[in-house]
Design a protein with these regions (language model features):
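A short, basic N-terminal segment
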Residues: 1-38, 43, 349
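C-terminal leucine-rich, beta-strand-based interaction scaffolds used for sensing/assembly
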Residues: 2-5, 285, 289-370
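P-loop NTPase nucleotide-binding core
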Residues: 36-37, 41-46, 50-151, 333
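Short regulatory helix/loop adjacent to the ATP-binding pocket of P-loop NTPases
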Residues: 56, 191-209
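Alpha-helical DNA-recognition elements
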Residues: 58, 171, 262, 341
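Conserved AAA+ ATPase "SRH/arginine-finger" region at the nucleotide-binding site
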Residues: 69-72, 210-221
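Conserved Walker B catalytic segment
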Residues: 122-190, 199
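Amphipathic alpha-helical "lid/sensor" segments that cap RecA-like P-loop NTPase cores
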Residues: 224-290, 352
């Protein structure tokens, strides 16, 4: 049988292929098992989704684990449909998984059964906007009636702030606190929005969860993990080359995994930094059309600021006179406006050391554009 590539870039392939996060996992599991909800905050590509699935694997079998990603949702009715579809049927026995049983709970929408390859039914819900809150209330009532321990992880939870409907936070908070045997994980990638939701006294979820910011994995731990898997495949591994990779991409999980995945695939070991350049070249070329369209869809001020931040790698003072002069940027007011636009579009974000291009491969493309 062909050996699996140990450096997964999509999904969760089990504890054998999961790097470190031992302290975070222990803290996470302890919170759930002691009836505390968790807020997990990390930029995208740091591995928070993988951590959620890893924690779910570590929990006692008495917990049913449910996961939904709401990043692409635009309004409350889409959330109601996604939430109900994820929850309903997850806590039941096969006998209970009948349309008639589910229909008893849901009067605000029409549930339908979708056939699955494994033979188990999956429910879909046709939710009209006017009945979205009612459908959500019915889903929580369904959870209450099941009387069964569960963990529900909602990824990119800050997206609810983008919904046009008002009062969504307060409505969800009132329901969440009413199901004591269900624990919730609220994960998000926008620090400022998640911080506002859970750390500001003005918001309904204020101090209602354990806050877990997620940092990058320790370099030595990651090197040990990578070395073990290269050696297991009979391939050599140079820690110095790995350190170059780690520093180039600031230890961010997705980039390390993507590049290690391709180096391991070649079967020649990881022996030099030149291999990193080869893989990055391929990644940039593969995405060049997308990056070009993205770049030229921005206005001139945003294009110039993107290029300037990419050129610096980590731009400390983007509104300073020296930064503007060095990169030949427009007035401070124009740069400030462009920065707000780029941040809202998730094209740049702020680290402890300064502003960076969110997608590091896009940053590589921008530096080559210059």
């Amino acid at each position: 049988m062909k050996q699996n590539n140990p450096f997964a870039v999509v999904g969760y392939n089990g504890p054998e292929y999961f790097c470190d996060r031992e302290k975070e996992t222990a803290k996470f599991v302890a919170a759930i098992e002691n009836d505390r909800n968790v807020t997990l905050i990390a930029p995208r590509r740091y591995g928070k989704t993988g951590l959620i699935h890893h924690v779910q694997r570590q929990l006692s079998p008495e917990y049913t684990c449910i996961y939904l990603d709401i990043f692409a949702l635009k309004n409350l009715s889409e959330f109601a449909r996604t939430f109900a579809s994820a929850v309903v049927g997850s806590l039941d026995t096969p006998v209970e998984k009948t349309l008639a049983t589910v229909a008893k709970f849901f009067k605000s929408c029409r549930p339908t059964v979708l056939p699955q390859e494994n033979g188990m039914p999956k429910f879909s819900f046709d939710v009209v906007p006017q009945q979205a809150e009612a459908t959500i209330a019915e889903t929580f009532e369904y959870l209450k009636r099941r009387d069964h321990r569960a963990v529900i992880a909602i990824d990119e939870f800050q997206q609810i702030l983008e919904f046009p409907e008002t009062g969504t936070e307060a409505m969800l908070r009132s329901h969440v606190q009413d199901v004591p045997w269900v624990r919730f994980v609220f994960a998000g990638s926008r620090h400022h929005m998640m911080g506002e939701m859970f750390l500001s006294a003005k918001h309904p979820f204020y101090q209602s969860t354990d806050i877990m910011p997620l940092d990058v994995i320790d370099r030595a731990k990651y090197a040990e993990f990578a070395c073990r898997h290269f050696n297991a495949a009979g391939q050599t591994f140079d820690e110095g080359a790995f350190t170059t990779l780690y520093r180039r991409f600031d230890g961010i999980t997705w980039y390390l995994q993507s590049i290690l995945n391709r180096i391991w695939q070649n079967g020649e070991g990881f022996t030099s930094a030149a291999q990193i350049d080869e893989v990055v070249d391929d990644l940039v070329k593969d995405r060049s059309i997308i990056f070009r369209d993205l770049y030229f869809s921005q206005n001139e001020s945003s294009q110039q600021l993107l290029s300037a931040i990419a050129a610096d790698g980590e731009a400390r003072e983007v509104l300073s006179g020296s930064f503007l002069l060095r990169h030949r940027l427009a007035a401070t007011s124009s740069v400030r406006s462009a920065l707000k636009v780029l941040q809202k579009k998730d094209l740049v974000y702020r680290t402890e050391n300064g502003w960076v291009v969110y997608d590091r491969i896009f940053g590589e493309w921008l530096r080559r554009l210059a």
